Amino acid sequence: MDYSHKYIKYKKKYLSLRNKLDRENTPVIISRIEDNFSIDDKITQSNNNFTNNVFYNFDTSANIFSPMSLTFSLALLQLAAGSETDKSLTKFLGYKYSLDDINYLFNIMNSSIMKLSNLLVVNNKYSINQEYRSMLNGIAVIVQDDFITNKKLISQKVNEFVESETNAMIKNVINDSDIDNKSVFIMVNTIYFKANWKHKFPVDNTTKMRFHRTQEDVVDMMYQVNSFNYYENKALQLIELPYNDEDYVMGIILPKVYNTDNVDYTINNVPMFSPAEINEFINNCQYSKVELYVPKFTQRKRYEFVPILKKMGLTHLFNKNDTDLNIMAKDAYISRIIHEAVVVIDEIGTEAAATTIVIGQAMATRPVKQKIKVFKADHAFIYYIRHQPTGLFLFFGDYQG
């Protein structure tokens, strides 16, 4: 089989859905629903709860991940789930994703500054469930190959897909040793985001500044004075920085107290906030003039996500004796979920990417006049990239310096 030719053929067919984005570098929005915008509130609530639960189940600090990439991958699995697995995923996600929901999210997540892509590689020993293939039409590249003789080529092509779809921000996410004789499919999701700030930071303003944590560090601190959506209470400050496409913002939640011994803090040295609390902070933002200090940074993290999801209560999907995923004629269970995310913040804007690799195995407000606020992110903080019309979190992390 000429795998490379077939891969390119399917990829070209898939990428043709977004060909206007690449034509002469003209920023054209594909399928952006702007009038009469609506999305089931339960989807946003599900995404926000999932974001919160994942973030506070990490055992390490300085995390960055994409709730959207993970959620979309689990939603694609839900489409193929039999009764018991479907019930398990619905309970875990807090929502039963339909094909219409997935198509809707796929459309709004593909824009002039963002793209979401999917690839499904299936072991050619098994036939693909035709109903599932039909559901993924227009959403994913689907190929079949020999998982025994072509392991090296498959891992190479998966890595090429991820590298291409993330603008080379993520490379070599899997190798041929990740594919064994029991592997029956590899599902790949990527998300890529690149946008300039509406209010850029003057490069000449960037200076070395101390960043407070257990050990004092020095970071490149960007600086500007401008008007932003801003909120504060006795415990924290929140600011949202708009991009040129104001459907997207980066938010920073900055605790006012940053003593690492503070009992109210998690292992991440940041306070615990529920999705409802974060939404309340956002809803109470006011347009205010702010003296703003934000570190210039790059953050990257890779995870094996099965242990994290098990810790959160999702177990049925990984049960090799009892999972009913109908991606192929043969039932399969999930053996690994690899997730990698990277975010780059500088004076011009933000570039971010994430990928989720699922490996399946066969079974045995108004402007107000106020004095200038000072927002100095010189200690640990939570940050996120959010799609404003839906309220969906695309990336979520904590910066520790």
Swiss-Prot record:
Organism: Acanthamoeba polyphaga mimivirus
Swiss-Prot/TrEMBL site (Reactive bond) positions: M363, A364
Molecular-function GO terms, alphabetical: serine-type endopeptidase inhibitor activity
Gene3D superfamilies: Alpha-1-antitrypsin, domain 1, Antithrombin, subunit I, domain 2
InterPro entries to which the protein is assigned, alphabetical: Serpin_dom (IPR023796), Serpin_fam (IPR000215), Serpin_sf (IPR036186), Serpin_sf_1 (IPR042178), Serpin_sf_2 (IPR042185)
Function: May act as an inhibitor for a host chymotrypsin-like protease.
GO CC annotations on file: extracellular space
Keywords tagged on the record: Protease inhibitor, Serine protease inhibitor
Name assigned to this protein: Uncharacterized serpin-like protein R700
Family from the record: Belongs to the serpin family.
